[in-house]
Each structure stands twice: as structure tokens, then as C-alpha cells.
Amino acid sequence: MSSAAPAPSTHAAKSIRKNGKNWHDNKKPFRPNGGLTSYTKRAAARKEQEAIKEYEKELREEREAERQAHIQRIKERRAAKEEKERYEKMAEKMHRKRVERLKKREKRNKLLNS
């Protein structure tokens, strides 16, 4: 009886298996789509997506700016209308010349305060 030394396996073991079944092949992770696209293609697609997102963001910002400008025009128009109505009410109570003087004074104050 000779010493029973285990015969070296035909394939080189990369690492020792945790469960001790070293005669089985090491399993690799199941990745069906793993190597189908190259890194350069993925990088190009990512770059293209980023460009599209940037363009969409610019469009959204432009649309929002137009919307804000429209809102601002409406507010200015309403303020002018209210001011005109206020002066008309004042004109009913006072003389025309005095209303014009008050208008000038308010415009001066508005310019100084702004």
C-alpha cells in the first residue's frame, strides 16, 4: 500500500470552493446580455442620451421663460388697468388739473423709489 496522495486535477483551480467540492467547475454569473454590446457602443449611446436630455431641458426652460414673460405681461396690463380706473375715480371727485398734478407726482415718486 502506497501513500494515497490526491491526484492533481486536470484543470487549475482558480480558488478553493467554499463547500469543498473542488472537482466541480466554478460557475460564472448568468449574464445573457453580458458581452453583446461593446463599451464604445454603450458610451456612445450614453452620450447621445445625455445630449437628448440636455436639448429637452433647453426646450423646457425656453417654454417656461415664454410662459413667465406672458404672465408678466398680463400682470403689467392688469396693473395699468387698475391705475387707470383709480385715476378715473379720482377725476370724478376732483378737478382734472389736480388729478394730472397727482399723476405727475406719483410718477416722480415711483421713479425715485425704483
Swiss-Prot record:
Bias regions of kind Basic and acidic residues — which residues? 77-93
- Quote the subcellular location field of this record: Nucleus, Nucleolus
Q: What does this protein do?
A: Involved in nucleolar integrity and required for processing of the pre-rRNA for the 60S ribosome subunit.
The name under which this protein is listed is rRNA-processing protein cgrA
Q: Name one Pfam family in it.
A: Cgr1
Q: Where is the composition biased (Low complexity)?
A: 1-13
Task: Spell out the coiled coil positions from the record.
Answer: 40-101
- Per the record, which residues fall in region Disordered? 1-47, 77-114
Record lineage:
Eukaryota, Fungi, Dikarya, Ascomycota, Pezizomycotina
Keywords associated with the record: Coiled coil, Nucleus, Ribosome biogenesis, rRNA processing
Picking any one GO biological process from the record gives: rRNA processing
Keyword Nucleus on this protein?
Answer: yes
Family matches, as InterPro entries? Cgr1-like
Q: Where is the composition biased (Basic residues)?
A: 94-114
* One GO term describing the cellular component: nucleolus
Domain of life, per lineage? Eukaryota
Which protein family is it in?
Belongs to the CGR1 family.
Q: What is its main location?
A: nucleus
Q: Could you tell me which species this protein originates from? A: Emericella nidulans (strain FGSC A4 / ATCC 38163 / CBS 112.46 / NRRL 194 / M139) (Aspergillus nidulans)
Give yes or no: UniProt keyword Glycoprotein: no
